[in-house]
Amino acid sequence: MTGEHKRSSLIKRITNETKIQIALSLDGGPVSLAQSLFKDKDYSAEHAAQATSSQFISVNTGIGFLDHMLHALAKHGGWSVIIECVGDLHIDDHHSAEDTGIALGMAFKEALGHVRGIKRFGSGFAPLDEALSRAVIDMSNRPYAVVDLGLKREKIGDLSCEMIPHVLESFAQGAHVTMHVDCLRGFNDHHRAESAFKALAIAIKEAISSNGTDDIPSTKGVLF
């Protein structure tokens, strides 16, 4: 990882089902979009937003609990990010949740660039009251995800519980990473899901941190 590479990206992903745009900086700092998808309507009361001296986070997928999870991922990963999605929520939450995961993964992959001078592997544990989750990740260029959260409810807010692991799987697909995310214990599904996203944030932050060299961390000599 060199000091000259600004680890940021700006992407748009448009299908017949969703319109998504994301501005991402993996190291925090300012981010912006040229034009919001929501220019004609004030969604400020409906999305997850936070601004500090080191981070700017604004997430609006139209699905409140998904916004909450992505806010936690960005906050504890040290990112600045704007995520906007307009999707076919009149059908259900599947396309918006899945496509947001894919698009965020794509933005992450583009922002990270060539895997050089980073640790590559990361792991993290995060508790939330009675819940405890573990995440392990590899910047491998091998998209694969094993996610076991043990959720029992049908929905949390407007997000189907079956979509929560699928969002993580979709992120892995878009980012071309290998990751294992497990909730080890807990009985509150909100806590189980949130601790999982926080654990993943911690794992990602470690994996993309500097290893003190400019080497590609692979015996193959090539990643991404």
From Swiss-Prot:
Q: Which GO molecular function annotations are given, in alphabetical order?
A: imidazoleglycerol-phosphate dehydratase activity
Q: List the disulfide bonds.
A: none
Task: Indicate yes or no for the key word rRNA-binding.
Answer: no
InterPro entries linked: IGPD_sf, ImidazoleglycerolP_deHydtase, ImidazoleglycerP_deHydtase_CS, Ribosomal_Su5_D2-typ_SF
Q: Which family does it belong to?
A: Belongs to the imidazoleglycerol-phosphate dehydratase family.
**Domain of life here?**
Eukaryota
* One GO biological process term: L-histidine biosynthetic process
- Which EC class, in a word? lyase
Which named protein is this?
Answer: Imidazoleglycerol-phosphate dehydratase
EC number from the UniProt entry: 4.2.1.19
Q: Give yes or no: UniProt keyword RNA-binding.
A: no
- What is the scientific name of the source organism? Komagataella pastoris (Yeast)
Pathway, according to UniProt? Amino-acid biosynthesis; L-histidine biosynthesis; L-histidine from 5-phospho-alpha-D-ribose 1-diphosphate: step 6/9
- List the catalytic activities from the record: D-erythro-1-(imidazol-4-yl)glycerol 3-phosphate = 3-(imidazol-4-yl)-2-oxopropyl phosphate + H2O
Keyword terms:
Amino-acid biosynthesis, Histidine biosynthesis, Lyase
